[in-house]
Regions:
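Extended, helix-rich architectural segments
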Residues: 1-149, 153-156
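Short amphipathic alpha-helical segments that mediate assembly, nucleic-acid/protein binding
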Residues: 2, 15, 193, 439-442
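Generic detector of well-ordered alpha-helical segments enriched in charged/polar residues
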Residues: 3, 20, 32, 47-50, ...
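Alpha-helix initiation/capping motif
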Residues: 46, 76, 176-177, 230-233, ...
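Extended, regular secondary-structure scaffolds
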Residues: 92-248
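Glycine-centered flexibility motif
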Residues: 108, 134, 295, 308, ...
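Extended, charged amphipathic alpha-helical segments
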Residues: 227-378
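Long amphipathic alpha-helical segments
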Residues: 311-454
Length: 454
C-alpha cells in the first residue's frame, strides 16, 4: 500500500483516486466534474523535494576502491572494468546515483538483487548486474540480527495453457546465502512422470512438484558461495510504525500535507473555474414557440424549443438581449435587476490559493526541518539561515550514509561474484557535518587561501 501511494504522489498515476466526494454538499455528477477539472501539482512538489537529495551523489565525498597485497593494481583495474557494465552501458556508481534515489522515492521497501548469468569461469569473470524487486514481488524474507537470511521473490509470466483462464504462470526465486533456487510453474502436459501432491519428484535437471493442481519445476543455480544473500533493501529511513522492520520514503513526513494539497488544489481548480465562468442569474422571457405553455405542448409532450423550461434561452454571454426603448424615461428597466453574474468571493479564492502555497512550503519545511525553501528566508537573520542550512544537511547526511552503505554492498557483491574480493578495500566516506557550501562561501574560501599564501 505504501508503494502504491508513493507511486501516485511521484508519478501522478492514479492521483484522482485520492480525491474524495464531499457527500453533504457535492453530488456524484459534480464530483466527477471536479475530478475532470483538477490539475494535480503534488507531483511537482515531490519532485522538488527529491531533487534536493541529488546533492548527495554530487557532494565532495571520498571514494576508496583499492586492493591490498600482490597484483593489487591489476585486480582493482579488473574490478573497475567489471563495474563499468553493471548497469548495461553505465557503471555501478551511476546506478546508485540514479536508480537508488528514484526507487527510494517510489518503493523503499523493494530490494535490489545482484545477479550474474552463467559464464565460463576458465575464460572470463562473472558480469554482475542489478535485478530490481518491487515490494509486491518480495513475498517473504527474514532477518536475524539485522542480517538478511533469505528472500523469496514471486513474479508472473505468460503461460498460455487451457487449465489457466488468465494464461499467467507463477515463478518463485529463493535467494539464500550461498545459492539461489528457482521454482517455475510449467505446463502439466509436458510432464510424463507420475506426481504426488506436495512431494518433490527428482529428475536429471531438477525436481517436479505438484501443488494445488499446479505443476512446478525446481532448479538450483550454481552456488555462488558469497556467504550472504545477494540482496539489499532499497530504503534507508526506517519506519517507526513497524518498529524499524520496513522503510519509508525520504519525503514520508510530508505525506499528510501532500494529501491535503491534493484535496485543496482540487477545490481551488473548481473555484477558479467558477470565477472565470460565474453563475448567471437572470429573468427570462416566456418561450414563444407555437403551442408551448410553460414548457409543455397541448398533446402533453415537451417543447422542443425551450426543452421544457418555458423560457427562451441565451446560449452564451456574447448573445445580446434586446429591449424596446420606452417613450417615457420612467419606464426604463434597470438592467442590473434582469441579469447578474455571481462567482465565489475573491476572498475565498485568495484563501485557497494561499493555503495551497502554505502546504507546498510546509512539505519542504517538514522534510528538511528548515524554512530555507520558502520566501521567509529572505528576511531571516544570518544565524537563522545557517541553522536552517545545518538542518538540511543533517537530513542529507542520513541519505549519504544510506548511499554509501548501498554502494559498498553492490561493490562487494560484484567483487565476490567476479572473484576479485581478496584484499579489497571499498567504501565511500562523507564528512560527518556534511557541509555543502554555496558559491559565495567557496569564493570566500579561495580568497582566504590566496591571502594565506602571501
Amino acid at each position: 500500500e505504501l508503494a502504491d501511494l508513493y507511486r501516485k504522489l511521484v508519478t501522478g498515476d492514479g492521483l484522482d483516486n485520492l480525491l474524495r466526494q464531499f457527500v453533504q454538499r457535492e453530488s456524484a455528477d459534480a464530483f466527477k466534474e471536479r475530478v475532470k477539472l483538477t490539475q494535480h501539482v503534488v507531483t511537482t512538489v515531490t519532485k522538488n523535494i527529491m531533487d534536493v537529495f541529488y546533492k548527495v551523489p554530487r557532494s565532495n565525498y571520498q571514494r576508496i576502491l583499492e586492493h591490498l597485497g600482490d597484483n593489487s593494481e591489476r585486480m582493482t583495474a579488473e574490478l573497475e572494468a567489471v563495474m563499468s557494465t553493471f548497469w548495461g552501458v553505465r557503471n555501478l556508481d551511476e546506478y546508485v546515483q540514479t536508480r537508488w534515489l528514484e526507487m527510494n522515492a517510489t518503493d523503499p521497501n523493494g530490494f535490489v538483487v545482484v545477479e550474474f548469468k552463467p559464464f565460463d569461469n576458465q575464460r572470463e569473470r562473472a558480469k554482475p548486474y542489478p535485478y530490481e524487486v518491487t515490494s509486491h514481488e518480495a513475498v517473504d524474507y527474514k532477518y536475524e540480527n539485522n542480517v538478511l537470511q533469505y528472500l523469496t521473490v514471486k513474479t508472473s509470466f505468460s503461460l498460455p495453457i487451457n487449465q489457466k483462464k488468465d494464461k499467467v504462470g507463477d515463478n518463485y526465486a529463493l535467494y539464500l546465502q550461498n545459492e539461489t533456487l528457482n521454482l517455475q510453474e510449467i505446463d502439466p502436459a509436458t510432464v510424463t512422470t507420475s506426481l504426488i501432491e506436495n512431494q518433490f519428484v527428482p529428475t536429471e535437471n531438477g525436481q517436479y512438484l505438484l501443488s494445488n493442481k499446479r505443476v512446478y519445476f525446481l532448479t538450483e543455480s550454481i552456488p555462488h558461495n558469497a556467504g550472504r544473500v545477494p540482496a539489499k533493501p532499497v530504503g534507508y529511513l526506517r519506519d517507526a510504525w513497524t518498529n524499524g522492520q520496513t522503510f519509508v520514503s525520504p519525503y514520508d513526513s510530508a505525506v499528510p500535507l501532500l494529501l491535503k494539497s491534493v484535496k485543496v488544489n482540487s477545490e481551488l481548480d473548481i473555484t477558479m473555474s467558477q470565477q472565470v465562468f460565474p453563475h448567471r442569474l437572470q429573468y427570462m422571457p416566456v418561450c414563444k414557440a407555437d403551442g408551448c405553455h410553460k414548457g409543455r405542448l397541448a398533446e402533453g409532450g415537451i417543447c422542443g424549443s425551450c426543452k421544457g423550461t418555458g423560457h427562451d434561452s441565451i446560449t452564451s454571454a456574447m448573445d445580446i438581449i434586446y429591449f424596446t426603448m420606452p417613450r417615457d424615461a420612467a419606464d426604463i428597466i434597470d438592467l442590473e435587476k434582469i441579469l447578474v453574474f455571481k462567482g465565489p468571493p475573491i476572498e475565498v479564492v485568495q484563501f485557497q490559493k494561499d493555503y495551497v502555497t502554505d502546504l507546498t512550503a510546509g512539505c519542504k519545511a517538514v522534510v528538511f526541518n528548515s524554512e530555507s525553501f520558502s520566501k521567509m528566508q529572505i528576511s531571516g537573520t544570518a544565524t537563522g539561515e545557517l541553522l536552517d542550512r545545518d538542518n538540511v544537511q543533517d537530513t542529507l547526511y542520513s541519505c549519504a550514509k544510506g548511499f554509501a552503505d548501498t554502494w559498498g554492498f553492490y561493490v562487494w557483491m560484484t567483487a565476490d561474484f567476479a572473484d576479485l574480493s581478496k584484499g579489497l578495500n571499498a567504501k565511500l566516506v562523507f564528512s560527518k557535518d556534511f557541509q555543502l557550501k554555496n558559491m559565495s562561501e567557496l569564493i570566500s574560501d579561495l580568497e582566504a587561501a590566496k591571502r594565506s599564501e602571501v
